[in-house]
Design a protein with these regions (language model features):
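Active-site region of glycoside hydrolase catalytic domains
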Residues: 3-7, 13, 89-92, 102-132
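Aromatic-lined substrate-binding rim segments of carbohydrate-active enzymes
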Residues: 42-115
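N-terminal carbohydrate-binding accessory modules
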Residues: 1-55, 85, 93
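The substrate-binding groove and active-site-proximal loops of carbohydrate-active enzymes
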Residues: 26-37, 62-79, 117-132
Length: 132
């Protein structure tokens, strides 16, 4: 994100989690910016907060941002930075779940289609070419 923020100190304690030395119960909901029109992002985040949640988890699908090899797009509906900033402003913690592979009933697990054009590459494997 473009602004520097103070990161919270998260500790796993014997009886739970503490954040900045305070015991916390994490209530987390999944909010996927890539399935919601940008105009509704703030509304959905606010509703989650109003329902008592204090955290979101969000996938960041690789193939949503890199449609063609080397062609990254983080504008408009793909502006994940703006989405994450809205979550922070709503008072929500974030569990970011970037690819390369995601579940969430997403085509190809969010792996870019161009990967299938490379002969001999074994996808989702220890293949050095894939890992590069």
């Amino acid at each position: 994100m473009s602004e520097k923020t103070n990161a919270a100190k998260v500790w796993l304690e014997q009886n739970g989690i503490s954040i900045d030395q305070k015991p916390v119960i994490i209530l987390c909901g999944s909010v996927f910016y890539f399935r919601i029109p940008r105009a509704l992002w703030q509304d959905r985040l606010n509703k989650l907060k109003e329902a008592g949640y204090n955290c979101i988890d969000v996938y960041i699908p690789w193939n949503y941002h890199e449609l063609v090899e080397g062609g990254w797009d983080f504008s408009g509906e793909r502006d994940v930075e703006a989405f994450l900033q809205m979550a922070v402003e709503a008072g929500l913690w974030i569990v970011a779940r970037p690819g390369p592979y995601i579940c969430s009933e997403w085509d190809g697990g969010a792996l870019p289609a161009y990967l299938h054009t490379y002969r001999g590459m074994r996808i989702r494997d220890n293949d050095p070419f894939y890992l590069k």
